[in-house]
Structures are given as structure tokens and as C-alpha cells.
Amino acid sequence: MKLTCVLIVAVLFLTACQLATAENSREEQGYSAVRSSDQIQDSDLKLTKSCTDDFEPCEAGFENCCSKSCFEFEDVYVCGVSIDYYDSR
């Protein structure tokens, strides 16, 4: 009978220790689902090819414009359809 009581107390003690340890490790980790979704969003941003919108500054000779056209306008290179395009219509 004494042995059974000692075993029950030991099992309860070990269970309490495991629960306390699990709670502490969860607080240190944070929410893993939130962390993993943030990591996925960051990796999506790195994988997505970004382009420069129309009328934003661009670098001549590089195809970084969404419209694939970088032209000089008032001493600055900008993305978009050049004014010559509108004049030829």
C-alpha cells in the first residue's frame, strides 16, 4: 500500500514538473503559427519580382519598370509610356 502511494505521488510530481516546463517553453517561443506565417510572408516578398510603377524614378538601361519602358523626362528617368508614344497616335 505504501509503495502504491509513493508511486502515485511520484507520477503526480513528474506530471506537474512537465506541465510547468511546457508553459515556460511556450512563453519563450511565442506563438509558432504567427512566427511561421511571418516567415512565409517574408519569403514571398523576397521571391516576388518587384517592378517600378509608372511615373516613378527608374534607372536607364535596366528593365525594372512594370511597363518595361524607362524614359527621360525633365532630366530625370521615369517609368511609363513616353510622350513620343502619345504624339505618334
From Swiss-Prot:
Top-level taxon: Eukaryota
Entry domain remark: The presence of a 'disulfide through disulfide knot' structurally defines this protein as a knottin. The cysteine framework is VI/VII (C-C-CC-C-C).
MF GO annotations: ion channel inhibitor activity; toxin activity
Major site of localization recorded for this protein: secreted
Tissue/organ expression: Expressed by the venom duct.
GO cellular component: extracellular region
Name assigned to this protein: Conotoxin Bu5
Subcellular location: Secreted
Pfam families: Conotoxin
Keyword Transmembrane helix among UniProt keywords: no
UniProt keyword annotations, A-Z: Amidation, Disulfide bond, Ion channel impairing toxin, Knottin, Neurotoxin, Secreted, Signal, Toxin
Organism of derivation: Conus bullatus (Bubble cone)
